[in-house]
Every structure is written in C-alpha cells, then in structure tokens.
Amino acid sequence: MASQEFEVEAIVDKRQDKNGNTQYLVRWKGYDKQDDTWEPEQHLMNCEKCVHDFNRRQTEKQKKLTWTTTSRIFSNNARRRTSRSTKANYSKNSPKTPVTDKHHRSKNCKLFAASKNVRRKAASTLSDTKNMEIINSTIETLAPDSPFDHKKTVSGFQKLEKLDPIAADQQDTVVFKVTEGKLLRDPLSHPGAEQTGIQNKTQMHPLMSQMSGSVTASMATGSATRKGIVVLIDPLAANGTTDMHTSVPRVKGGQRNITDDSRGQPFIKKMHFTIRLTESAITYRDIVVKKEDGFTQIVLSTRSTEKNALNTEVIKEMVNALNSAAADDSKLVLFSAAGSVFCCGLDFGYFVRHLRNDRNTASLEMVDTIKNFVNTFIQFKKPIVVSVNGPAIGLGASILPLCDLVWANEKAWFQTPYTTFGQSPDGCSSITFPKMMGKASANEMLIAGRKLTAREACAKGLVSQVFLTGTFTQEVMIQIKELASYNAIVLEECKALVRCNIKLELEQANERECEVLRKIWSSAQGIESMLKYVENKIDEF
C-alpha cells in the first residue's frame, strides 16, 4: 500500500529501518490483522490523529513501565537495607555463646548448614518461578482460524477433521503456558476436558514435556504446523522483538520486498509470525481463498514472486482455486490482491531461468499452463468480479476482459507493453482489446505499450467502475455482497447469454496466442529479448 491511500483504522506498532527512518504498522479499515503493513511516516501525513494517538499511548506505557521499574528498585534497596540493619542489630545485641566441647560445636555447624540449605532452596525456587514467568511471557502458541474438529483421541492424540473455514475465522488466539513440562492450555483438547478457570488439564505430546527453556522459531517450524498438533513460537527468537506483528523488515521507495529466511527468496508483504491453520493457508502458498457468505474471494498474495507476478506455480494455484469455486455453493468469485500492486504479469526472470535449461520442454510446459489458465476464465460459468487495487500489467491486465465486472481503485493503472517484454500478446487480448476499445486504442496498448489511468480504462471499457481510494474496499464489499444476495441461477444465465456468441472465438484466440508464445520462447532470440528486459527493467512501483 505504499503508493496508494487507504483508510487507516489504527496504528499498531512502530519501528525504525536500517536508515533510521520511522515506520508504523498500520491496521487498514476493512482488512484483518494479517493484512497489516509497515508504512513509512511520510505515507501517513493524512493520518496525524492516528499517529498522535499511538505515540501518546506509547509514551504513557513507557512512563508506566519506568515508574514500575523504579518502584521495584526502591523496594529491593529498602529490603536490602532492612536486612542489613537487622543483621547488624542481631550481631550487636546477641550474646556470644561460649563453645565448651566438640559435640556442641559440631551440632551448631549442622544447624548452620541446614539453615543455609533452606535459604539456598528458597532462592532457587524463587529463581525458577521467575524463569517460568519469563518463559510464559515469551512462549505463545497462535492457532487462530483453525479449521479442525477434535472428536476422537487415539493414544493421547486428537484426530483432526476440517470444519467450515468461516466458523474457523471466528476463533480467538490461544495462549499456551508451560510450567515444569505441563501444558496448561491446549487448543486440541477434547471438548469435554476438565477445566479449572481458563486452563484445561489435558495430555500433551510426550516429546513436548522434555522441552525446556525458550522455544525458537526453528523448533516451532518442526512442531507440526500443518497437522495442527501444537505450534510454539518464541517471538524473541523469531523476530528479535516481542511484537508478533513483524511484517516487512525494510521498506524502500514504496517497494515491499521481504526475504523469506527459510527459502532465501524475496516476496511481497504479509509474512506475519501468526500461523493461520485455515484451509487456504494449508492448501495454497501464493494465494488466499476466503469462503464468504454467497461468494468466494481469491486474494493474490504471492510469496514466491515479487509484486504478485505470475509463474507456473502461482497460475496452477489460481486454476485450482477457480475449479474449487466452480464446484462449491458460492454464487460468484471475487478476485483481489494484497499489497500495492494488483499483478505485474508474468515473472520473466523465472521464465528465463527455466527456458535456459531446455527451451523446447520448458516453453511447452509454460504455454500449456497459460493456455489452461486463460481457458479456465473463458469457461467459468459463475460471474467473476475483479477488484483492482493497484497497477495491472501484462497478463494481469489482459485477463480483465474475460471477467464480468472490473472495479478499480482510482490510483490503479493498466499497461500491456508486450513489445518491451519481448513477447506477443496473451490472455486473448489480441481479440478482446480491439472489440472493447477499437483497433487504434488496442494497438496503442498492445504494440506501443501505452499506460492507461483508471479513468481512461473505464472510458475505454476495460474497467466498469472506478472508486475513490479512501472508500475503495468498503465500496467493493458493499456491492459484492449485494450481488451475492441475488439468485445463483439468474446470475449464471445472465453471464451465459452475454458470453455465448464469443466463447468459441475466445478459445480459438487463446490457442493462436499460445502457439506464437511457444515459438518465441523456444527460440534463442526470444529468450535474449526477455533477458534484456529483465536486466534493464525499471521499477515503477
């Protein structure tokens, strides 16, 4: 959201990047906490009240913490002074007892040693208690949105069955505490488990009882994340801070690139240390699927590519999500994207790397993936609504005419610079663009690579509605929910009537475009053109 204006609900956290610039973790209105993003201070010029309120709360919290620390120090010093004065008075006032024999001396030594042991045990108990408090404050288990049901227990473990993802979204974060190897609260406990207050006395994994000290992020990764057994995260070890909302480590020039330490690949936003055990999180890596009342929302949020670019893995996930939505009870599909970019088209860096190894095989595989992707849109029976929140480039723009409604943020823009890419048009744009905006405008976009603003795209028919940035999300959700209230059969029949005359034409255009792409990608000149673009491309975001 670096280049757009969205409505801010609250400021959640604050930090400084490596250059000393202040950044704020922003909770966006209309979005969940997993969509929080770090924004530079200059992006929040219109949100001075939210920033002021956050800074005021932080100042009050710091003052309270300072006062508490000072009170503890004063109390400890006073306790030490009292102890010293008591010892001094006792040593002055107490009479010296003469020791007459060895038996009496050995008895006194034993009593003295016993008293020292008692004091040592008491001190160690206090130290252990303090250490456990620290562990309890750092070890948290996050299991929101768990789609699992807990019905049968076999050898101390629960059999996990999926629930409705909508109901799972309503669950709260569960905090585990570990005390001397015993789990006090387990989200997988049987519903009939005995409870004391808010704590459940349940069995735990036998290996978990052997764990001591802090639980690191690597340990959490190996603790059955996708199976839903137990997930322990130490935020200090994972993030370097105690805040669980660490998202984008550094923001530079409006660009959100995060490095996934486990894979060494950059990806855009949305890497919170919150484990969401939803159906979408388990099934997909680069998209998020939300089952809403009457519609399915597919959010493009790529982790394997930058700026929501499309490679074969991302495309296959989108096709699988569309096929699932076609078979479920949803009436329509809402396509949207996370971050400040809707979609920047194909990931040419990925394509060049694969084409260098075996041009013929790789080009055929990529072309088949794109052909299947476009045909899925052409043959999809339910209405598809697209919410374009930012720039749509290449295939991200050419796919829009195959959808039924396209709602754009006024900050969005559209471009299909295929000649700059070193490739030919895709997504049936060779036929949909001329039909939609005329040959002259289509050539301007497909050959000359002209960039259209949201208003211009709406005037040419590429976009159906343009909304203000501040109310974009709210307007989209209001209208999509209204559409979802209509009769499902009527919606499908309306789309079928509109598409019946051009469906075959679109499939033939897709076949021709993919054949040309295969020829270009299997040639040395085609790979050289793409490589040149990748090396010389300018970041416009």
Swiss-Prot record:
Residues 6-66 form the Chromo domain. GO terms for molecular function: histone acetyltransferase activity; transcription corepressor activity. Residues 87-97 have a biased composition (Polar residues). It comes from the Eukaryota. The keyword Acyltransferase applies. GO terms for cellular component: nucleus. It catalyses: L-lysyl-[protein] + acetyl-CoA = N(6)-acetyl-L-lysyl-[protein] + CoA + H(+). Residues 72-104 are annotated as: Disordered. It is found in: Nucleus. The keyword Transport does not apply. Testis specific. SMART domains: CHROMO. Keywords: Acyltransferase, Nucleus, Transferase. Gene3D superfamilies: 2-enoyl-CoA Hydratase, Chain A, domain 1 (3.90.226.10), 2.40.50.40, Lyase 2-enoyl-coa Hydratase, Chain A, domain 2 (1.10.12.10). Its EC number is 2.3.1.48. One of its GO terms (biological process) is spermatogenesis. May have histone acetyltransferase activity. This is Testis-specific chromodomain protein Y 2. It comes from Homo sapiens.
